[in-house]
Amino acid sequence: ELKEQVVFVSGQVEKPGSIPLVGTYITVFEAINKSGGLGPLAWPSRTKLIRIENGVKSIIKVNIKKIRKGERSLDVILKPDDMIVVPEAIF
């Protein structure tokens, strides 16, 4: 039985949880939108993508603030089991 391929979105988004990867690819920005968008306390410029490949964990910074302003080249295509963390802004 094939395990459903998903990515996980946590932290300051409206609906944290898993998002299925169906057919086409999805980016960090799109996954956040599918999670209801950024929460009121989000710090989008400090968003992190946590990826484990071959047992090696890497943390990739993804500046959602710049991507929202049109710098689409900064967005990252997600792989199964990727975890997106949107931190809370510190005031």
What are these regions (language model features)?
Residues E1-F91:
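Ser/Thr/Pro/Gly-biased, low-complexity, turn-/loop-rich segments
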